Amino acid sequence: GNAIPTGTVIVLENIYYDFGKWNIRAGAARELDALSALMKKYPSMEIELSSHTDSRGSDEFNKELSVKRADAAHRYLVARGVDSKRIKPLGMGEALIRNKCKDGVECSEEEHQYNRRTEIKIIRIDEPVSIKYEDKGPEVIDRKKD
């Protein structure tokens, strides 16, 4: 078969969402397309998709929204031929805000956008690769006020 060159570096990016929504944006689709190709190339690879919201809205609403976001990313990969069992979707709600923008803190749309993400983590891979997690941040800031 094709031996994977040792030291292949897999770079994984976070994907981002619009406010209150869970649809897969264009930038996210590009990342997930690349991820599905990687998962086909490395058959042992299993991933965790942990989805997060910004702090606006109730904890319950955000928990549900994050589950929908994780599921949307999961479904997207499965639609591209990845076995569902290799993907573990997790909805984290607003539990892991990455900046100061917790409940009641005034923040810009940019700052809120940074929190609306799914983080992709490799939880298993048998092939000899190194993994790099990068975050260029969202390519689009959703400024729509619902």
Residue ranges of predicted features:
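Periplasmic peptidoglycan-binding/tethering modules of Gram-negative envelope proteins
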Residues: 1-46, 122-146
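Periplasmic OmpA-like peptidoglycan-binding domain that tethers envelope proteins to the cell wall
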Residues: 50-146
